[in-house]
């Protein structure tokens, strides 16, 4: 079979595929190394102040400090001058939720006078509470047919009585306690007596000179309770509040007067009054 066909098809031929030279042998050479170059970093030049610049800035800081010290001394001088003239710069801090007035008993009133001042402050708040309840009582009476006039008068009592009490007797007492001014004590006594008279009058509430039921006192309470028990109860509560306010106010004026006499302020007030009369005469 082998002789007939001449060669065996399964016989390996000893053939070199690269013998013809058509495919070049692999080159074993390396790539050339990269040249060494210096890293190109950014250079940041931070200039250092010279001694001349430092001295200049130091002089500027010293000038600013001197100016601030000058302003501080000027402000202190104005505050001292205002204090000597009786002018007090006050920040509004009361009531806390809506400041309307300056009020700081613990820091501005001497310790031995703070109790009296707190009692007077309670009297002021008590008057506000009485007049506010008086509005409620007259409102119930108005609803039950007593007329709108008494309600309008109750509103007038409140919006005039509370600020009036603060200006006429509470603030003078506050300043008197703080500055030990005898004349301010005299002003307080005058208008606080009027306050006590009004509280006693309101507790009774006669039909004159005010409109009969515009004050929640004992007489209107007796009059209306027969027609309306609810209105009568509101008026009796108002009567009780005015009685408590009257008693508290009497206690306040007694304590303030005892301090006024014991501290020699009465004689001082007489001397100041006499001095004022002489100066006005001449």
From Swiss-Prot:
Residues forming coiled coils: 48-92
Gene source species: Oryza sativa subsp. japonica (Rice)
Subcellular location: Cell membrane; Cytoplasmic vesicle, Secretory vesicle membrane
GO biological process: protein transport
Cytoplasmic compartment residues: 1-117, 251-282
Protein name: Secretory carrier-associated membrane protein 3
TM region(s), chain numbering: 118-138, 148-168, 185-205, 230-250
Encoding gene, per UniProt annotation: SCAMP3
GO cellular component: plasma membrane; recycling endosome membrane; trans-Golgi network membrane; transport vesicle membrane
Chief place of localization: membrane
Functional description taken from the UniProt entry: Probably involved in membrane trafficking.
């Amino acid at each position: 079979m082998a002789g007939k066909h001449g060669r065996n098809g399964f016989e390996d031929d000893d053939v070199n595929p690269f013998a013809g030279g058509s495919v070049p042998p692999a080159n074993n050479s390396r790539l050339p190394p990269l040249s060494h170059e210096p890293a190109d970093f950014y250079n940041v030049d931070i200039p250092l102040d010279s001694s001349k610049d430092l001295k200049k800035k130091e002089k500027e800081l010293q000038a600013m400090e001197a100016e601030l010290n000058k302003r501080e001394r000027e402000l202190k001088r104005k505050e001292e001058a205002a204090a000597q003239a009786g002018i007090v710069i006050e920040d509004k801090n009361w009531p806390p939720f809506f400041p309307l007035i300056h009020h700081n008993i613990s820091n501005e009133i001497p310790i031995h006078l703070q109790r009296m001042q707190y009692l007077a402050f309670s009297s002021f708040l008590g008057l506000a509470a009485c007049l506010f309840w008086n509005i409620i009582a007259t409102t119930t009476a108005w609803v039950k047919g007593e007329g709108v006039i008494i309600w309008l008068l109750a509103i007038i009592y409140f919006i005039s009585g509370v600020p009036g009490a603060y200006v006429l007797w509470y603030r003078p007492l506050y300043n008197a306690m703080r500055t030990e001014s005898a004349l301010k004590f005299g002003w307080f006594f005058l208008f606080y007596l009027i306050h006590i008279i009004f509280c006693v009058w309101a507790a009774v509430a006669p039909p004159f000179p005010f409109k009969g039921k515009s004050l929640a006192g004992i007489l209107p309470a007796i009059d209306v309770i027969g027609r309306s028990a609810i209105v009568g109860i509101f008026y009796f509560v108002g009567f009780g509040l005015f009685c408590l306010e009257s008693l508290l106010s009497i206690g306040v004026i007694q304590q303030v007067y005892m301090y006024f006499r014991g501290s020699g302020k009465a004689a001082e007030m007489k001397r100041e009054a006499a001095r004022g009369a002489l100066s006005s005469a001449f």
